[in-house]
Amino acid sequence: IYLPVIMGNGSEVYERCRELDCPPFTLVAIGGLDWNRELSPWECDGTIRDAEPFGGQAAGFLDELLKQIIPQAESSLPQPPAWRGVAGYSLAGLFALWALWQTDVFERVASASGSLWFPGFIDYARERTMTATPDVAYLSLGKKETKTPNRMMRHVLDDTRAMEELFIERDIPDRKSVV
């Protein structure tokens, strides 16, 4: 599982998965990212006045992930992985989902409290075909996210439910939503 992280090294995520008795997996945590620039699919204003804008450089990070990070990580494994997943929290959750429309290398995806409020993303997803349909998809959204006064972000619940419906329409065989 490839996991962009804003802080830490992903060990908390891995340990939590072990506590939940998840089957064994390899976790590749990717840090050092300029979150708003490298995980946003296109440019847009920040979420509040005078906030850092979103840079729209996700394609560049995805290219680095596909051409450098994945080959390097998987070359150290004793055998090729049985499946490959991409996961993320917040803006990285948006990136994980967006990646499904860009490449067919991920069979599984998880978006935890994904920034599905991102302007134009749900329409983008509806209007295009995924490069490959994942075998497993997970969506979650915390209760606090739905109560934000921020105009840009306040429809995140509707957008997460819209993505859930899109997964149903696209016949993703194993999907789980905690919304």
Regions found by a protein language model. Give the residues of each.
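Gly/Ala-rich beta-loop-alpha elbow adjacent to hydrolase catalytic centers
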Residues: 87-92, 96
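Short beta-strand immediately N-terminal to the catalytic nucleophile in serine-hydrolase-like folds
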Residues: 83-88, 112
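Catalytic His-Asp charge-relay segment
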Residues: 134-146
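Conserved hydrolase catalytic core segment
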Residues: 98-108
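Active-site nucleophile loop of the alpha/beta-hydrolase fold
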Residues: 32, 110-118, 142-145
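Conserved small/polar residues in nucleotide/adenosyl-binding loops
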Residues: 178
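Active-site-adjacent alpha-helix of alpha/beta-hydrolase-fold enzymes
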Residues: 143-174
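Serine-hydrolase catalytic machinery in alpha/beta-hydrolase-like enzymes
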Residues: 1-64, 68-76
